Amino acid sequence: MQDQERFIWPHKDLLDVTQLSREQIRHLLDLAGQFHEINQRPVKKVPTLKGKTVVLFFAEPSTRTKTSFDMAGKRLSADTFSLAKSGSSLVKGESLKDTALTLQAMSPDVIVIRHTSSGAAQFLAERLECAVVNAGDGWHAHPTQALLDAFSLNRAWNGQFEGKTLLILGDIAHSRVARSNVHLLTRMGARVRLCAPRTLLPAGADTWPVEIFDNLNKAVQGVDAVMALRLQLERQQAGLLPDLREYASRYCLNLNHMQHAAPGARVLHPGPMNRGVEISSALADAGQSLVLDQVASGVATRMAILFLHATRKDTGDR
């Protein structure tokens, strides 16, 4: 790819956005931009990773992320294979070690893993010679989602993160997406606000480089983008939030809220959406919504991620 020969990707694995420098994030976003252009062509497949093997190991249910990675690999001409969770034994560390040995025997070039346990991706990365890409581990991290969100915002903000403000709204306590976006966007120079009921804020959030609100009307003032998060309905059963009607009356993002945001402010949602709970249907379908753009961005961004990790120079760094 253009300029790739002059930039050596130093990381064997992508486990968390915290491992990436600002320059590396910018390079990845620029590369994703090239793949995004390719994806607009009538023929979208390129021979870039022909002969490479990508294994999709999803030990947690996923439709969007798994499909996005599968499409990304196929558009790069890689051979992609899916390995599904089989039984409860994969949850335990010893069985995950056995799984790592099984995967190693397949001689893949990249393994994409999603797992219910925080740290599962790192566990594999420390035991495998091939590249490991974290597609979400427990509540810990979801680096590829944060990178695709940054790619969507990069396009919407004309490449300028400095001086921009993103509001993240909803169930932040249980969101690996929120954690990864906070780390990535603040590293790129953006400001981040959080808005949620106190019961849905993570412990230690007051030490993050963010502003925290529990009032949406105040939180949305002057922001350049709002990311509404999926409300995990099982949290209501755990007593962490009131009934859905009361939650929606206070935290469902709508067109009226966006009138108080900065001119041209955009709306994001990592999906799947609970319309009328986290975001109104009218706003989700409005012109300022980037929800469908995030889906397209996901394929291009994951093409860049697979390309970098399947072709990187062997520096020994993680």
From Swiss-Prot:
Entries under PROSITE patterns matching the protein: CARBAMOYLTRANSFERASE
GO BP terms in the entry: 'de novo' pyrimidine nucleobase biosynthetic process; 'de novo' UMP biosynthetic process; amino acid metabolic process
A Pfam short name: OTCace_N
Binding positions (carbamoyl phosphate): 64-65, 114, 142, 145, 271-272
InterPro entries from the UniProt entry: Asp/Orn_carbamoyltranf_P-bd, Asp/Orn_carbamoylTrfase, Asp/Orn_carbamoylTrfase_sf, Asp_carbamoyltransf, Asp_carbamoyltransf_Asp/Orn-bd
EC numbers, comma separated: 2.1.3.2
Coiled coil: none
Gene3D superfamilies in UniProt: Aspartate/ornithine carbamoyltransferase (3.40.50.1370)
UniProt keyword terms in alphabetical order: Pyrimidine biosynthesis, Transferase
Catalytic activities: carbamoyl phosphate + L-aspartate = N-carbamoyl-L-aspartate + phosphate + H(+)
KW Iron (keyword) present: no
GO cellular component: cytosol
Binding-site positions, L-aspartate: 92, 176, 230
Membership in a protein family: Belongs to the aspartate/ornithine carbamoyltransferase superfamily. ATCase family.
UniProt function note: Catalyzes the condensation of carbamoyl phosphate and aspartate to form carbamoyl aspartate and inorganic phosphate, the committed step in the de novo pyrimidine nucleotide biosynthesis pathway.
HAMAP family (alphabetical): Asp_carb_tr
Assembly mode: Heterododecamer (2C3:3R2) of six catalytic PyrB chains organized as two trimers (C3), and six regulatory PyrI chains organized as three dimers (R2).
Protein name: Aspartate carbamoyltransferase catalytic subunit
Species of provenance: Oleidesulfovibrio alaskensis (strain ATCC BAA-1058 / DSM 17464 / G20) (Desulfovibrio alaskensis)
Gene field: pyrB
